[in-house]
Amino acid sequence: MSIEVNKITKLYGEQKALNEVSFSIKSGEIVGFLGPNGAGKSTLMKIISCYLPPSIGTIKVCGLDVMEQSMEVRKKVGYLPEHNPLYLDMYVKEYLEFVGRFYDVKKLNDRVKEMVEITGLTIEQNKKIGQLSKGYRQRVGLAQAIIHD
């Protein structure tokens, strides 16, 4: 998956959270954002994953513009926010099936089983998300972020 970020600026009133940020990531590269609190790392991730619009600039994910083709981009990008919004009344497997249907995942039952296994949720899969520890909830969030990959 390639990502092209071109002169992204994000304004909150007169406050610049991002100021003409540009970079490119080639398919297969692994990168991380490092910086102090308030540097704009989370803001940039929200823009890349179509959860927040930029004030100025463009971003393309796999050649798709995040503003003009946001639904297509969302189907390609898995995003685990810091405060993971989960349906606490749903069971783990039920939630992953729900997310998988949203992304039109093929062989959904097999994919849910795979996600449960690789994220270490096997013994928790039949519990309600609200019954899980914070660590297991993060694992559920990770599973939902990568289920469509």
Model-derived segments and spans:
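ABC transporter nucleotide-binding domains
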Residues: 3, 10-149
